[in-house]
Every structure is written in structure tokens, then in C-alpha cells.
A protein has these predicted regions:
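Conserved catalytic loops of ABC-family nucleotide-binding domains
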Residues: 84, 88, 92-117
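Conserved beta-to-alpha transition
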Residues: 6-7, 126-138, 150
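H-loop (His-switch) and adjacent beta-strand-loop-beta switch element
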Residues: 110-111, 117-134
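ABC ATPase nucleotide-binding domain signature region
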Residues: 1-16, 108-117
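ABC ATPase nucleotide-binding domain helical subdomain, centered on the C-loop/LSGGQ "ABC signature"
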Residues: 6-45, 68, 89-93
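Catalytic Walker B motif of ABC-type/P-loop ATPase nucleotide-binding domains
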Residues: 72-76
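ABC-fold ATPase nucleotide-binding domain signature/coupling loops
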Residues: 30-59, 77, 81, 145, ...
Length: 158
């Protein structure tokens, strides 16, 4: 989308300055904006400034958080960010301490190290929930992995 960062985040919604800047900070975008020529009014996209994959992921997350929905489906929101930004996003958005702390959050991830932070964990296999664990039963990612059935091996075609 060729538009300013702000327009990309607002996505047609009313501008709430305080909440907007809270979201940018929680999504670890404020440091990036300090380096951009027009801060959040910089045009990004094909006809504007190119942004990195990590910045795109954080922009998409900011747009989602700014929507103020009651339910959030986050598809691997931590995959394109480094460990420091990952921790920042967990603390400031996803976990109970974050902006979405009082919302229902469904998060897909391949990051086993965050599993102990979840209050429920479900493994989906072939479109069905194959394992569901409540946190009191999960103490480490290793214990969860031990409870998760291994996928069947694909037949050798050679």
C-alpha cells in the first residue's frame, strides 16, 4: 500500500494520538521513525520508502493492535524480528502486561521458547486440534513437546 506509515496503521480509523503513539512504541517502531525523513508521515510502499521485512511485520502488528478489536488472530507475529524486539513485543503487546493483555489472543508460532508463557496451548494437525494443554500442566517447552505426537514421516519416494 503506497501511503504514509500513519495511514497504513489507521487503515481508515479515527486518529487517537495517545493510543497511536502507544501502539507505535509497543510495536518497537519509534526508533525507526526517528531515522525516517518525515517520521510517521513518510510514504512507504512501491512508490515510497522501502522497509525491511521486520518493519513490515511490526507495521502489520501495529495496524492490528490499533484496530482495538476484542479478539486477535496473530499469525507468527514474532518470526521476522530479533530476540530483543521479540521480548519487547511479548511484554508490550501479547502477554497480559501488554496492550492486548485483556483481549482474547490466538497466536500461531514456531518459537517453542514462548510456550511456557501461554495460558493454553493447542497443536493443530491436519486441521484438527490434536493436543490441548492448560498452562498449569505446562512447565517447560520440553514437557509440552513430549506431550505432542510426532507427525508421521512422509513415504520415501526414491
Amino acid at each position: 500500500m503506497n501511503a504514509t506509515l500513519r495511514a497504513n496503521i489507521l487503515f481508515g480509523r479515527e486518529y487517537d494520538e495517545d493510543y497511536y503513539w502507544k501502539v507505535l512504541s509497543a510495536c518497537a517502531l519509534t526508533d525507526d521513525l526517528e531515522m525516517w525523513p518525515k517520521s510517521d508521515m513518510t510514504v512507504i510502499g512501491e512508490n515510497g520508502m522501502n522497509i525491511s521485512g521486520g518493519q513490515r511485520a511490526r507495521l502489520a502488528l501495529a495496524r492490528t493492535v490499533y484496530s482495538r478489536a476484542d479478539i486477535y488472530f496473530l499469525d507468527d507475529p514474532l518470526s521476522a524480528v530479533d530476540a530483543i524486539v521479540k521480548r519487547h513485543i511479548l511484554d508490550n503487546i501479547i502477554l497480559s502486561t501488554g496492550l492486548l493483555g485483556d483481549k482474547l489472543r490466538f497466536v500461531t508460532t514456531n518459537a517453542d521458547n514462548i510456550l511456557p508463557l501461554c495460558n493454553q496451548i493447542a497443536t493443530v494437525d491436519n486441521g484438527r486440534v490434536s493436543v490441548k494443554v492448560q498452562t498449569p500442566q505446562v512447565h517447560t517447552a520440553f514437557e509440552f513437546k513430549a506431550a505432542t505426537p510426532k507427525p508421521a514421516k512422509a513415504a520415501d519416494s526414491t
